[in-house]
């Protein structure tokens, strides 16, 4: 009976969380921040509990490909394992007629918890523009990212829509700080640090 209650609680908590491949409110700016690769950590509040994830991304021609993994402490319902892969490719370049740059995003991931496993395939478009601060090496990218996410597994399926709002802040040549939040079928906030190579 206890496993059934925990399974139901995890499904209820995890179903709305579908921003990126692991269901946390970590979103992507339309730009590649790194030259060759990046390694980082994300701490997020996906609506219930706290999630901690590590990530690694590389650039492959026009695509950025990454893996992420971590844990989500779901406020009394146990700890879920988070696993995902993400991709991003540039789709729009700003012009006189359209002021934003854009990137197509695609992911696949899982929230694994005892018998309550959820799988996600988020598809989105990130739109934003880099702002360089005059006389400084600091720059930032404010962006928004609508995401449509099919969610399935453990007898549960849904189609979720959310909008991520975020800013990537380049504080040094090899360090990005990132903040994002979600609106829509999910909510939550995240902060990340990425070490750029």
Each model region followed by its residue ranges:
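Short, intrinsically disordered low-complexity segments
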Residues: 1-2, 67, 128, 177
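Extracytoplasmic beta-rich ectodomain segments of secreted or membrane-anchored proteins
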Residues: 84-86
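Outer-membrane beta-barrel translocator/receptor signature
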Residues: 49-60, 65, 69
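Phosphate/oxyanion-binding active-site loops and adjacent basic polyanion-contact surfaces
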Residues: 79-81
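Generic detector of short alpha-helix boundary/capping microenvironments
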Residues: 7-8, 88-90
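Outer-membrane beta-barrel transmembrane domain signature
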Residues: 20-40, 44-48, 60-62, 73-77, ...
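Homeobox/homeodomain signature
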Residues: 3, 29, 53-55, 165
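Cleavable N-terminal export/targeting peptides
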Residues: 1-33
């Amino acid at each position: 009976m206890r496993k059934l209650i925990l399974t139901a609680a995890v499904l209820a908590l995890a179903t709305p969380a579908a921003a990126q491949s692991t269901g946390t409110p970590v979103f992507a700016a339309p730009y590649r921040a790194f030259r060759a690769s990046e390694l980082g950590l994300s701490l997020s509040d996906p609506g219930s509990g706290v999630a901690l994830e590590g990530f690694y991304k590389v650039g492959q021609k026009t695509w950025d490909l990454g893996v992420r993994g971590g844990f989500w402490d779901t406020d009394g319902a146990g700890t879920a394992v988070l696993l995902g892969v993400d991709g991003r490719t540039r789709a729009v370049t700003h012009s006189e007629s359209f002021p934003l740059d854009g990137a197509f995003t695609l992911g696949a991931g899982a929230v694994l918890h005892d018998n309550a496993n959820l799988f996600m395939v988020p598809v989105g478009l990130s739109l934003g523009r880099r702002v360089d601060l005059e006389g400084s090496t600091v720059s930032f990218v404010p962006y928004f990212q609508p995401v449509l996410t099919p969610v399935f597994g453990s007898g549960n399926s849904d189609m979720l829509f959310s909008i991520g709002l975020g800013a990537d802040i380049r504080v040094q040549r090899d360090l990005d700080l990132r903040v994002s939040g979600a609106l829509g079928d999910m909510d939550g906030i995240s902060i990340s640090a990425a070490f750029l190579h």
